[in-house]
Amino acid sequence: MEQQDQSMKEGRLTLVLALATLIAAFGSSFQYGYNVAAVNSPALLMQQFYNETYYGRTGEFMEDFPLTLLWSVTVSMFPFGGFIGSLLVGPLVNKFGRKGALLFNNIFSIVPAILMGCSRVATSFELIIISRLLVGICAGVSSNVVPMYLGELAPKNLRGALGVVPQLFITVGILVAQIFGLRNLLANVDGWPILLGLTGVPAALQLLLLPFFPESPRYLLIQKKDEAAAKKALQTLRGWDSVDREVAEIRQEDEAEKAAGFISVLKLFRMRSLRWQLLSIIVLMGGQQLSGVNAIYYYADQIYLSAGVPEEHVQYVTAGTGAVNVVMTFCAVFVVELLGRRLLLLLGFSICLIACCVLTAALALQDTVSWMPYISIVCVISYVIGHALGPSPIPALLITEIFLQSSRPSAFMVGGSVHWLSNFTVGLIFPFIQEGLGPYSFIVFAVICLLTTIYIFLIVPETKAKTFIEINQIFTKMNKVSEVYPEKEELKELPPVTSEQ
């Protein structure tokens, strides 16, 4: 009875844990979502600014092709920066810690926020392009570090719920940018620099508030070897002094991983004991972006117009779609511990698969069947619901759960790189797919959804309510290795690396 009471106390959501989660997610994940959508509404106004700036310098306006190219570079700088940010994750979290990396990362938000806010006054579109690269780096770091930080703060029974919170704040950021981006608010000639500059507000708040909250106890004990600090952090997070059982669990992981040290990305790819974990995050992160989520949003306005929505009202319908995304991700926070990660992934990708197939038929028939555009709208909303339940929030959560402390930073670097490269690839090639396949474009995404669903069904285990060591034992059997920490033996066979730390 006493042990059960202790488990209940250790597993509760305390005020400190809740506030740490909200500040980390609002200060970092929110910015990611905000910057995804912030340039969509004022796109034409910003291109006009580019052209006027060029005219002021040269006395002539740009041709259509260089203007389109310049805008494409502006948009693509964000995912490119995200890729760079993903590569910085390992070095930052190992040097500064999880909390320290988030605080350092605010540089890549506050500086570009000031630059973008001043770009119109300075008559420099170059400031916007550079700033988009910097906020991309910020998003690349935060999209990996926030799930890692929250996953290491949370007790095992809350790890799923808190692990979905970053994705919830990404969707909230998208919705807020869509609302602020309404033409009668900030998507106008005077307002768009303010719209872009507001991204610095969450960063400034995080910079002020996050230092008062604990660092990851796992980082403190396993990597900094400071058990006293780790115990104090756990006591603050759990709201009571008796945290010996959790400290013992972290110490057990530390003892088992001492021989492993820091596992680099190169070692990660060479280790048989991490084979299925690595392949799983590549498939899930690739499937998340290549399943067509960005293409759906790209196509949504056209679908709404074809259904008879007046052009001046499309912006409100788009914001409504963003609200659906927020609501369904909010639901995922509460059901992830009830239904589990695996079921939400299977359900989410299956809904996306069906939505892509029906949408293909609806787009092909919309000129001959009068009510087909309404089916298209249903498909868009259904896809958004499906993606918000599983494919969007779960993959980053699983990276935290299926890797141990020594390999987790490198795993996030790999997963983040796949995420951003896939994001960039879809943005680059979808217009060509659309031009070549027309209404059948979404068949490509349906196939990816199908393949990802099959992989999840056959390979990905359930991780709900399991400790990191218990999850590692599941993959030990899958990888056909003889012990829970086989990297100790494998690392002996690798050539020595002198500058690995």
From Swiss-Prot:
Residues with the N-acetylmethionine modification: M1
Residue positions the entry lists as glycosylated: N51
The protein's name in its UniProt record: Solute carrier family 2, facilitated glucose transporter member 5
Cytoplasmic side: 1-18, 92-98, 150-161, 214-277, 335-342, 395-412, 461-501
Extracellular side: 40-68, 120-126, 183-192, 299-313, 364-371, 434-439
GO cellular component: apical plasma membrane; extracellular exosome; plasma membrane; sarcolemma; specific granule membrane
UniProt-listed InterPro entries: Fru_transpt_5, GLUT, MFS_dom, MFS_sugar_transport-like, MFS_trans_sf, Sugar/inositol_transpt, Sugar_transporter_CS
TM region(s), chain numbering: 19-39, 69-91, 99-119, 127-149, 162-182, 193-213, 278-298, 314-334, 343-363, 372-394, 413-433, 440-460
Induction: By forskolin in Caco-2 cells.
GO biological process, one term: fructose transmembrane transport
The organism's place on the tree of life at top rank: Eukaryota
Topology in the lipid bilayer: Multi-pass membrane protein
Tissue: Detected in skeletal muscle, and in jejunum brush border membrane and basolateral membrane (at protein level). Expressed in small intestine, and at much lower levels in kidney, skeletal muscle, and adipose tissue.
Job description of the protein: Functions as a fructose transporter that has only low activity with other monosaccharides. Can mediate the uptake of 2-deoxyglucose, but with low efficiency. Essential for fructose uptake in the small intestine. Plays a role in the regulation of salt uptake and blood pressure in response to dietary fructose. Required for the development of high blood pressure in response to high dietary fructose intake.
Main localization (coarse): membrane
Species: Homo sapiens (Human)
Binding site for D-fructose: Y32, Q167, Q288, I296, Y297, Y298, H387, H419, W420
Alphabetized UniProt keyword annotations: Acetylation, Cell membrane, Glycoprotein, Membrane, Sugar transport, Transmembrane, Transmembrane helix, Transport
